[in-house]
């Protein structure tokens, strides 16, 4: 038979403060079923790509000037086709085992510039909607601060979802390999409370030794 599919994208959004939470968090925003030729969405993604590439190039030049020559095209990516700050640090350490702590701190210092290059949650949701798609909060218990994964508690997820609902989020990813049954149940309850649909995702990005593509679920209320 035929395979049914919809268009999809995952956007790493700019960090922002959420309600009463003390630390800014970056969420991953999923877009499903959109028109991939939509000019607003395409322009937003293209501009973000250009900003990010400029930051990485500036970082490479700064690291090179500090005595450790590197080129961004030479940096192996650990997550599919998405370059991450940790990839640059791993590349520097592999090429220069005796790299100074100052150089490592230099790499880390670019986290702020990279998150500022990202798309805001509000703009991301609006662009996905403009393209006729649905916006979904990916792996809600896992967010990021300065590109370091943060594990959230249920109350924190609840606070953030309240704001996301006001911004027009359509759904949340409730089925995720790392989530416990109780966590999934809590997310499904929140989805029902806010009238959101739920999705399942394996978070597979095409990388070797990173999880697995697809997942089984006995629920039937998912977009995919």
Model-derived features with residue positions:
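Charged catalytic cores and adjacent phosphate/nucleic-acid-binding surfaces used
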Residues: 1-36, 126-224
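Mid-domain alpha/beta scaffold segments of enzyme catalytic cores
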Residues: 1-40, 44-58, 62-83
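Generic signal for short, ordered secondary-structure residues
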Residues: 42, 107, 169-170
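Short, contiguous strand/loop micro-motifs
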Residues: 46-47, 110-112, 147-148, 174-175
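Alpha-helix N-cap and loop-to-helix initiation/capping positions
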Residues: 47-51, 116, 149-156
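Aromatic/hydrophobic pocket-lining residues that form the small-molecule binding cavity
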Residues: 56, 121, 157
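Hydrophobic, aromatic-enriched interface-forming segments
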Residues: 60, 65-125
């Amino acid at each position: 038979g035929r395979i049914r599919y919809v268009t999809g994208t995952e956007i790493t959004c700019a960090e922002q403060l959420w309600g009463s939470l003390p630390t800014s968090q970056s969420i991953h925003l999923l877009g499903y079923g959109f028109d991939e030729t939509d000019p607003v969405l395409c322009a937003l993604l293209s501009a973000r790509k250009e900003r990010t590439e400029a930051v990485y190039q500036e970082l490479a030049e700064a690291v090179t000037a500090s005595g450790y020559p590197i080129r961004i095209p030479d940096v192996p990516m650990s997550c599919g086709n998405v370059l991450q700050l940790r990839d640059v640090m791993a590349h520097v350490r592999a090429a220069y085992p005796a790299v100074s702590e100052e150089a490592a701190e230099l790499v880390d210092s670019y986290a702020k510039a990279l998150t500022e290059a990202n798309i805001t949650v509000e703009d991301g949701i609006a662009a996905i909607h403009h393209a006729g798609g649905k916006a979904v909060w990916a792996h809600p218990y896992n967010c990021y601060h300065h590109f370091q994964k943060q594990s959230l508690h249920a109350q924190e997820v609840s606070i953030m979802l309240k704001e996301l609902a006001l911004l027009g989020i359509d759904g949340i990813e409730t089925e995720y390999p790392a989530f416990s049954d109780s966590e999934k149940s809590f997310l499904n309850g929140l989805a029902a409370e806010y009238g959101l649909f739920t999705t399942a995702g394996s978070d597979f990005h095409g990388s070797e030794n990173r999880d697995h593509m697809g997942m089984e679920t006995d629920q039937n209320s998912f977009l995919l």
